[in-house]
């Protein structure tokens, strides 16, 4: 006989959460903030009760976030103090170097900067407030909402799309006219060059 274990849910101060990536899309954060702000206190509580933040326990029992960085940043900026986390793995017995190596090999971190360049683990911010804006990550989020690709379970799939767009659409063009850049992104997403990306939903034959 096997016993199914329920995930352990713990309230944690948002300011204490540790990122496992360097960037977020600040447009995505703004959308999360709007969503939170538009709800009543009761609805916000219900939302937070169904959107637990997954974490890995690291050295000193610190909570390292493996998903929902945009939500965590939005909560921080909206002044919401605590969020429920679900611990997916306890690696608190490891030293710092071993811990980050495990995160990296398990696909639980994304140490790439706003230019798509891989950085040393020390470049990962220690707080959600220090996450850097990557406009191409915002484009990837909007692209998925517009049907450019399907939601996928591949870790950090939106960052793969962000890097695809980064190599093809000029950053100044994105800053100058986001909507126009999105039209180009939507067209690119259906092409064969994007066929290797998770959630690709372009034509499979000519």
Name each model-derived stretch.
Residues 64-67:
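Short hydrophobic beta-strand that contains or immediately precedes a catalytic carboxylate
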Residues 2-46, 50-57, 61-62, 76-206:
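Surface-exposed, charge/polar-rich loops and edge strands
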Residues 69-71:
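Active-site-adjacent structural elements in enzyme catalytic domains
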């Amino acid at each position: 006989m096997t016993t199914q274990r329920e995930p352990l849910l713990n309230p944690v101060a948002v300011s204490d959460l540790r990122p496992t990536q360097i960037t977020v899309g600040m447009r995505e954060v703004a959308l999360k903030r709007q969503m939170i702000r538009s709800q009543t206190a009761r609805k916000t509580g219900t939302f937070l009760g169904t959107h637990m933040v997954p974490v890995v326990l690291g050295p000193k029992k610190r909570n390292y976030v493996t998903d929902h960085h945009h939500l965590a940043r939005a909560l921080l900026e909206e002044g919401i103090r605590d969020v429920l986390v679900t611990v997916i793995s306890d690696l608190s017995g490891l030293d710092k170097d071993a811990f980050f190596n495990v995160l990296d090999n398990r696909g639980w971190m994304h140490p790439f900067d706003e230019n798509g360049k891989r950085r040393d683990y020390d470049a990962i911010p220690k707080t959600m407030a220090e996450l850097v804006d990557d406009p191409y990550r915002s484009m990837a989020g909007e692209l998925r909402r517009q049907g450019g690709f399907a939601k996928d379970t591949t870790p950090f799939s939106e960052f793969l799309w962000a890097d695809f767009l980064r190599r093809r659409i000029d950053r100044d063009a994105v800053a100058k006219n986001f909507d126009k850049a999105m039209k180009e992104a939507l067209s690119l997403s259906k092409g064969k060059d994007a066929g290797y990306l998770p959630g690709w939903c372009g034509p499979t034959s000519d």
